[in-house]
Amino acid sequence: MDESALTLGTIDVSYLPHSSEYSVGRCKHTSEEWGECGFRPTIFRSATLKWKESLMSRKRPFVGRCCYSCTPQSWDKFFNPSIPSLGLRNVIYINETHTRHRGWLARRLSYVLFIQERDVHKGMFATNVTENVLNSSRVQEAIAEVAAELNPDGSAQQQSKAVNKVKKKAKRILQEMVATVSPAMIRLTGWVLLKLFNSFFWNIQIHKGQLEMVKAATETNLPLLFLPVHRSHIDYLLLTFILFCHNIKAPYIASGNNLNIPIFSTLIHKLGGFFIRRRLDETPDGRKDVLYRALLHGHIVELLRQQQFLEIFLEGTRSRSGKTSCARAGLLSVVVDTLSTNVIPDILIIPVGISYDRIIEGHYNGEQLGKPKKNESLWSVARGVIRMLRKNYGCVRVDFAQPFSLKEYLESQSQKPVSALLSLEQALLPAILPSRPSDAADEGRDTSINESRNATDESLRRRLIANLAEHILFTASKSCAIMSTHIVACLLLYRHRQGIDLSTLVEDFFVMKEEVLARDFDLGFSGNSEDVVMHAIQLLGNCVTITHTSRNDEFFITPSTTVPSVFELNFYSNGVLHVFIMEAIIACSLYAVLNKRGLGGPTSTPPNLISQEQLVRKAASLCYLLSNEGTISLPCQTFYQVCHETVGKFIQYGILTVAEHDDQEDISPSLAEQQWDKKLPEPLSWRSDEEDEDSDFGEEQRDCYLKVSQSKEHQQFITFLQRLLGPLLEAYSSAAIFVHNFSGPVPEPEYLQKLHKYLITRTERNVAVYAESATYCLVKNAVKMFKDIGVFKETKQKRVSVLELSSTFLPQCNRQKLLEYILSFVVL
């Protein structure tokens, strides 16, 4: 790729950001712009005094309540009004008061006594798992099927030999898969972890009320399914350790077979871990591995039948971006199938949020820079432990969401009307290519609804499981506490990229903390803001530079501008992204609507007003564009509905104000008369076809027009929100630019490598506005999105995905429209 391509070459630059309009110095604001030392959240200053006072005196929010819409009966179970007030507890702080003994010797031996008094014994765990799995009907059928394929025309004797051969193979697989839990090993590991965690973590906080709900769930004699977010390898041990400390039996943990290494694998098996393949789909010859799938299914069914607890990581692998990744629902589908066969009466689902000040891996810069992932080995584990002992990784927070009934969730979904099945291509192409007649709004609506009514049971089942997985991950992500490193990294990258005085950073930190609490997210820290900020800066290490200035004897804090440091700061900054993600989407959509009019787009709206309906639809389309970046909203809500609610919050904050009646007179056509030139299909509306015709929605509605506040603090907040999505949108727009030079079919791994090299080169030559836009995660997500919306066709050649342009995007003009669409949201 030559340098001209890096500067966007011959592409129509009238739609591209002008570098002269961007100054990193815009990220730097004085303390006066954030307000005086009253530290009220800036966007709420226009609210009433009473509302502001209640905000400042608010208690910590209690996170993790289940969805009332999908599980109304579970909402009242395991919860009572006193639970939120039970407060936090540091799990690794143990002394003689946590044992039945007192005195000098008890103080010296408190760890040993505490571990010895935990309730763990052999009778808690599954027995005869291997034999029961091998004798299950599904496994027997799979063995017979595989044996028949090995010896299709053989005699009965040869067939018997083939069956025995397959059975031996099945036993070998189960030896790797089936865990043999050892109570003695759990106790020993508990004592070791108590020592280790105290050496490299300041504390591990849990909410006592949440643990009370989990304990109440264990008394139902139903299997529990723990579904945590996945940030670090420590996640595997952390949950088991916490449950052990509270006399709750250890769950069986699904682990990737990359951790099946000598000695370490034995430890994992003894603690309840069982290894599964990272890819279940195919055998080396390209066919489905019927035997392995049957064994895995039988193993999960047997554990649930014996009322064991399971722990599954829905993301499949550790998040390399700091955001909660999209769900991979393979194992979850096995759990749902088990319930549908009436083997067990019900399963209780418990999403789990885990937050670290600093993960023990430190960062994933190597993989984000495109280097291949190193395979785990005993030596790498030993080096990791030694490295951990040399450092302190700050605080950890684990949040257990309210348990909910899987049976109730499935029944509630079956009673809901089947909504339109919209693919990303159906949702976004009308916005990207509005002139395509086949994608007209009305036609898209009818087609999608007919497809949903004619959908097979299997497609509906897959959709149900995918929605369940998204529901769980959204709740787990919402439960994740915001850590001090998350806020400091976010402020340094997206408010003070050129540096800031420590005193101002502390003020802004306090403001951001209040903003987080106001959105019902909890914090993973407490104490004096200055101390907490210094703690975070210390943990961020070489990513932050501290210099002493002569002015007022002040310290000046600057984020490092090297690519690895920016990647690392972005990883921790993404820990706070989900707090503001919907507001950031509205802020970027606000820019898109206003910028379109500034470029002379067709509009009947006065220059100082914007259409709320147009803003909401524009934001809904951006939600679809970013849907590969994680779960943006609950699947029981449409993007249209969530965007509509977020615009309402902007009105509540005072960022947007509703135009006076006189201003709206004669300019607000009914919704039926409006023709958006980039209108999304009607199924994006949150109104159901089954709405009561007597309701207000049965009447003709008139659009609402809004004004944008011009106050400095509101404009600064909008800018901050827009910058949060800056790296994502720059990565997607750069990928769209790269598509202009696409030539011929190319293997997907090769294309990913070329695109990533292009983004890294832009960063190294200071062409990129956001260096963090070049992370490999964003490259993969952008290409996946382009496949989903129909830019690329994907074919398989020798088990390798090959990409080529679809007929829709063969014309250069359509690729240009894709680029223009993404750039319409980009603020520089």
Swiss-Prot record:
Resulting phenotype, residue 102 to E: Abrogates mitochondrial localization
UniProt keyword terms in alphabetical order: Acetylation, Acyltransferase, Lipid biosynthesis, Lipid metabolism, Membrane, Mitochondrion, Mitochondrion outer membrane, Phospholipid biosynthesis, Phospholipid metabolism, Phosphoprotein, Transferase
Residues holding CoA: 278-279, 288, 293, 328, 462
GO cellular component terms, semicolon-separated: mitochondrial outer membrane; mitochondrion; plasma membrane
Topological relation to the membrane, as annotated: Peripheral membrane protein
Effect of residue 230 to A: Abolishes catalytic activity
Topological domain ranges for the Cytoplasmic compartment: 1-87, 119-828
Keyword field contains Lipid metabolism: yes
Impact noted for substituting residue 101 to E: Abrogates mitochondrial localization
Location in or out of the cell: Mitochondrion outer membrane
Region annotated Disordered, chain positions: 435-455
Motif HXXXXD motif mapped to chain: 230-235
Biased composition (Basic and acidic residues): 442-455
Region (Important for mitochondrial localization): 80-120
Reactions catalysed according to its record: sn-glycerol 3-phosphate + an acyl-CoA = a 1-acyl-sn-glycero-3-phosphate + CoA; (9Z,12Z)-octadecadienoyl-CoA + sn-glycerol 3-phosphate = 1-(9Z,12Z)-octadecadienoyl-sn-glycero-3-phosphate + CoA; sn-glycerol 3-phosphate + (9Z)-octadecenoyl-CoA = 1-(9Z-octadecenoyl)-sn-glycero-3-phosphate + CoA; sn-glycerol 3-phosphate + octadecanoyl-CoA = 1-octadecanoyl-sn-glycero-3-phosphate + CoA
Intramembrane segments: 88-118
Predominant cellular place of this UniProt entry's protein: mitochondrion
Pathway: Phospholipid metabolism; CDP-diacylglycerol biosynthesis; CDP-diacylglycerol from sn-glycerol 3-phosphate: step 1/3
Reported effect, residue 98 to E: Abrogates mitochondrial localization
Source organism, top-level taxon: Eukaryota
Family listed: Belongs to the GPAT/DAPAT family.
Name of the protein this chain belongs to: Glycerol-3-phosphate acyltransferase 1, mitochondrial
